Amino acid sequence: MLVTGAGSGIGRATARICAEAGLRVAVWDLDYESLASLTDELTTGGATVVAAAVDILDEEAITAGFAATQEVFGHIEYLVNNAGPTNAAEVSFSHGITMAAGSTANVTSAWLALGRRDGDAVVNVASVAGNITGGGAEAWYPSAKAAIAGFTRYLALRRPGWIRANAVAPGLVDTPRMVAYMQDDEARSIIERNPMGRAGYPDDVGAAICFLLSPAASYINGVVLPVDGGAQVTV
């Protein structure tokens, strides 16, 4: 399997949980130190890991990254599109859309071009912000996440080969990126309104992603699964 944006947060949790389930994991990120520490963590646990610093806006880099992964793993059954801009507040609308939604489409297209088999699956990381008000998010963020949800449903409908395509839609998740971006008062307000009374953890989302990839979810297709502690029912 391949996880983009695997260096921290949801991507890192997904890679670890899926590795613990016995999957071979390829991890892409542009943060070399995070990639190195993740690789050490996973290999110490006995996992087979391929790590690469891949710019997911560069189609040639994407192709090279897949080639390097295939040399070790052969067929890549599962794809998790998680990468996005690291400094959300400083991103322009067009760049945010390209970085989040455009890169998801580019990586998925390159993955599909490698050839698919029955049972292959992709999970994209959307957001509840794409379904409900974006709150304090920059305009590009809910727009990009809504596009990712739509792209996921498109893939499920078209089903190139025999893939399944699903997405997760996290609410507020306690990741370094989110904590740095949101003001404390805003985060507290969201948490107070949540039926579960807390923010999500990366493992909450990672576990949902790994489930959607697994044979246990073999008849789940075209779903955008909220992983938000019930935040959507309060709107």
Task: Please report, for each region that a protein language model flagged, where it lies by residue.
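Short, small/polar-rich loop/turn modules that mediate ligand/substrate recognition or access, typified
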Residues: 160-164, 220-222
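A conserved structural motif in NAD(P)-dependent oxidoreductases
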Residues: 194-205
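Short, flexible catalytic-loop segment of classical short-chain dehydrogenase/reductase
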Residues: 169-180
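The beta1-alpha1 cofactor-binding region of Rossmann-like NAD(H)/NADP(H)-dependent oxidoreductases
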Residues: 32-33, 53-65, 203-204
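Conserved glycine-rich cofactor-binding loop
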Residues: 7-9
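Catalytic loop of short-chain dehydrogenase/reductase
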Residues: 85-89, 121-160, 172-173
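Short C-terminal tail/terminal secondary-structure segment
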Residues: 132, 210, 221-235
